[in-house]
Swiss-Prot record:
Record has DNA repair as a keyword: no
Family: Belongs to the dihydroorotate dehydrogenase family. Type 2 subfamily.
A biological-process GO annotation: 'de novo' pyrimidine nucleobase biosynthetic process
Protein name: Dihydroorotate dehydrogenase (quinone)
Binding site for substrate: 66, 111-115, 170, 175, 244-245
Source organism per UniProt: Rhizobium etli (strain CIAT 652)
UniProt lineage: Bacteria, Pseudomonadati, Pseudomonadota, Alphaproteobacteria, Hyphomicrobiales
Chain positions recorded as FMN binding sites: 62-66, 86, 139, 170, 215, 243, 266, 295, 316-317
InterPro entries: Aldolase_TIM, DHO_dehydrogenase, Dihydroorotate_DH_2, Dihydroorotate_DH_cat, Dihydroorotate_DH_CS
MF GO annotations: dihydroorotate dehydrogenase (quinone) activity
Pathway involvement of the protein, from the record: Pyrimidine metabolism; UMP biosynthesis via de novo pathway; orotate from (S)-dihydroorotate (quinone route): step 1/1
NCBIfam families from the UniProt entry: PRK05286.1-2 (NF003645), PRK05286.2-5 (NF003652), pyrD_sub2 (TIGR01036)
Main function: Catalyzes the conversion of dihydroorotate to orotate with quinone as electron acceptor.
Length: 362
């Protein structure tokens, strides 16, 4: 039986340009038109990572709910956590339209949005009004015209400290000129020192230590991975998110849309991002939490991220093609896979294919 959303998406939503369709989906979630997912909690999926308890390992990645409009509605779809943003100190419009492109044959998306968002103040007001206890992370970035990008990240920590369950410092978007330069070792050391000092200062004031993750690109050299791992362990960071979108266009079927500039996400990113994830797990060791992102489209691909070294996983682009039922289907599917593997917890399967993925081509 064909999923009703897929019929609607291909015949309805896909008639609209991607950015308009995205706005319609946010409106539908706000209005309650999208039904909540009914999932029986599975204690085998529950885990504590970076001091936070996650009911299941599946999260909504940053980029969908940029302005913190629907975090609780997303959690009701079955996600174990969600991440708002990327949010910058001041509002900014991002890059000119069109700036999102569907590659339907590839089940992929190319975007060059450029951190379009309403700024810290608007997102903070919405997060302050939340009544639920779900895990909502805040992805922070820098304004395109900022004269001191590190100061922008520090401002994000200070602004959202009372409402964030965790932070993600996004230094890996390819759509803000020069942003990925912050992944270079000297720049990264300065960034992490400043961000973690701000976090520690706020923790001392509030009595709550909020974990900080770093989101990295998949387009890294081996030396680049070495540098990030070394700095993550030296400071120390609370975790990594692997990975953001890629500039690679290798193996795409839709060569017309592939020519668009921007970051590629969706199914074609799975192999590359999972290989980088495994390489980073090898570098940072067993203790540092890692969230795996890129091409998660099913329970099987979510579990494969975990087998490659992830503690948690996130998705976004694949929901464009699979619809709002995807998170619930994945969570239920993970329970079924644990049955098949006769595993007592999802944690038991982490790293079980680490060597395989670490040896794969990046």
């Amino acid at each position: 039986m064909i999923d009703p959303f897929k019929r609607l998406a291909r015949k309805g939503l896909f008639l609209f340009d991607p950015e308009t369709a995205h706005g319609m989906s946010i409106a539908a979630l706000k209005s309650g038109l999208v039904p909540a997912c009914q999932i029986t909690p599975d204690p085998r999926l529950r885990q504590t990572v970076a001091g936070l308890t996650f009911e299941n390992p599946l999260g909504m990645a940053a980029g969908y709910d940029k302005n913190a409009e629907v975090p609780e509605a997303l959690l009701r779809l079955g996600f174990g956590f969600t991440e708002i943003g990327t949010v910058t100190p001041r509002p900014q419009s991002g890059n000119p339209r069109p700036r999102i492109f569907r590659l339907v044959e590839d089940e992929a998306v190319i975007n060059r949005l450029g951190f379009n968002n309403e700024g810290h103040e608007a997102a903070f007001e919405r997060l302050s009004a939340l009544t639920g206890k779900g895990v909502v992370g805040v992805n922070i970035g820098a304004n395109k015209d900022s004269e001191d990008r590190i100061t922008d990240y520090v401002a994000g920590i200070r602004c959202f400290y009372s409402v964030a369950r965790y932070f993600t410092a996004n230094i890996s978007s390819p759509n803000t000129p020069g942003l990925r330069d912050l992944q270079a070792r000297e720049s990264l050391a300065a960034l992490l020192s400043a961000v973690l000092a701000a976090r520690d200062e706020m923790a001392e004031r509030s009595g709550r230590k909020i974990p900080v993750f770093l989101k990295i690109a998949p387009d890294l050299t081996e030396e680049g991975m070495d540098d990030i791992a070394a700095e993550a362990l030296a400071h120390p960071l609370d975790g990594l998110i692997v990975s953001n979108t890629t500039l690679s266009r290798e193996g795409l079927k839709d060569q017309r849309q592939a020519k668009e500039t921007g970051g590629l996400s969706g199914v074609p990113l799975f192999e590359k991002s999972t290989a980088v994830l495994a390489r980073m797990r090898k570098r940072v060791g067993a203790a540092l939490p890692i969230i795996g992102v890129g091409g998660v489209s099913s329970a099987e691909t979510a579990l494969e991220k975990i087998r490659a070294g992830a503690d948690l996983v996130q998705l976004y682009s694949c929901m464009v093609y699979e619809g709002p039922g995807l998170p619930g289907n994945i969570v239920r599917g993970l329970s079924g896979l644990l049955d098949r593997e006769k595993a007592g917890s999802i944690r038991e399967l982490r790293d079980s294919r680490l060597d395989y993925w670490a040896a794969r081509k990046v």
